[in-house]
From Swiss-Prot:
Keyword Nucleotidyltransferase: no
InterPro entries: Aminoacid_DH-like_N_sf (IPR046346), NAD(P)-bd_dom_sf (IPR036291), SDH_C (IPR041121), Shikimate_DH (IPR011342), Shikimate_DH-bd_N (IPR013708), Shikimate_DH_fam (IPR022893), Shikm_DH/Glu-tRNA_Rdtase (IPR006151)
UniProt-listed Enzyme Commission number(s): 1.1.1.25
Name recorded for this polypeptide: Shikimate dehydrogenase (NADP(+))
Length: 283
């Protein structure tokens, strides 16, 4: 881990409505302890009508930066100076000060790509990918894949109009397809990504036969409750490499911590075990 340059007390927070069940405090306090940084990370439940006042006076509330979650991500983009990633994704989840300027970024992109790099090195050798879903998470995934150099992304969604709208946003390398056409897009695809809630606890399963995927393909699922979805279980049974949603959750937290506390932390097996235990305890 990169060591901090200062020991001054720094505080960050998670702003949401509601935000009480986030694992972010557990993750950031683990890193603060490991790096010996005098700092804190707390949760602030802020309703939509109070969000602008809270963010514009973040320092007055005692914070040097913040994570932003539902339902504030789009509004955060408007109240800050966003970077290219936040603009492309259409949402900001991390706020930080650059002098007196409050800037924002979207670390879901880095979290997704870093998790793939850690879980399946060399995954980006494929020119083709299939992405399931066209919601907010899909925008971060598609942007990250295009930024990494993937040449063609088949984007499947139950609403083909929504898939087309996202494809129009990102250009000709993103091809919208009907949900029922997803199986036909799997042959030759070196990466399959599920960005939908299908397979999540309490949701219907993702009914997709992985047999057409190449033997060296990678399967990623953004769902992390349960830790191993049926999609990932089937992929592993076929000998395919996988990247789970918990890994993305951990990796997306790295950049925010670095921006606020001045040290780049590491995603370790110890941290993962800690968060896994918390997920099981609150299942």
């Amino acid at each position: 881990m990169t060591q901090p340059t200062s020991q001054a007390h720094i505080a960050a927070c998670l702003i949401g409505w509601p935000a009480a069940h986030s694992r972010s405090p557990l993750i950031h306090h683990y890193w603060l302890r490991k790096l010996g940084i005098e700092g804190g990370y707390s949760i602030e439940s802020v309703p939509p009508e109070g969000f602008a006042e809270f963010v514009l006076h973040l320092k007055t509330h005692g914070y040097s930066g913040a994570n932003v979650t539902i339902p504030h991500k789009e509004r955060a983009l408007q109240l800050t100076v966003p970077d290219q990633r936040a603009c492309a994704v259409g949402a900001a989840n991390t706020l930080y000060y650059d002098g007196s300027v409050l800037r924002s970024t979207n670390t879901d992109v880095e979290g997704f790509i870093s998790n793939l790099d850690a879980s399946a090195p060399g995954w980006d050798r494929t020119p083709h990918a299939v992405v399931l879903g066209a919601g907010g998470s899909s925008r971060a995934v598609v942007f990250g894949l295009l930024e990494r150099g993937i040449q063609r992304i088949a984007l499947a969604n139950r609403s083909i109009e929504r898939a087309r709208a996202l494809a129009d946003l990102f250009g000709e390398r993103v091809v919208p397809i009907a949900w029922t056409d997803a199986p036909a897009a799997l042959p030759g695809a070196g990466l399959l990504v599920n960005t939908t809630s299908l397979g999540m606890k309490g949701q219907p399963s993702l009914d997709l036969d992985l047999e057409p995927l190449p033997a060296d393909a990678t399967v990623a699922d953004l769902v992390y409750v349960p830790l191993e979805t049926e999609l990932l279980s089937e992929a592993r049974a076929r000998g395919l490499r996988t990247a789970d949603g918990l890994g993305m959750l951990l990796h997306q937290a790295v950049r925010g911590f670095e921006l606020w506390f001045g040290a780049r932390p590491e995603v370790t097996s110890e941290l993962r075990a800690l968060v896994e235990a918390d997920l099981v305890a609150h299942a």
